[in-house]
């Protein structure tokens, strides 16, 4: 199993972008993840079918998201989040293609990797 689970956007003004998305597409916020504070961000998640749309925005200077906003000179795509049934196998395949792991988390109910 390998599927797209979530698309994340990055924005200067979280509330404005989330408000526009909710109004335009009839969405509503389902969750704010306090865990993204670890990365200097705040966020909002919305459900679309069986997937999520997330918007993140920097809350401090020097974040990856903030640097991307500056480089692009505006809001845009930030990351795609996939779900897979065999993380170890997938990671071995990605290592063969020089994909870097920039963050790893192993928790009781979920394992995750941020890749570049």
Region spans (language model):
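Short acidic/glycine-enriched loop/turn segments that link adjacent beta-strands
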Residues: 37-40, 76, 109-113
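Short, flexible helix-coil linker/hinge segments at the edges of structured domains or between repeats
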Residues: 55, 61-70
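Beta-hairpin (beta-strand-turn-beta-strand) motif
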Residues: 58, 83-85, 106
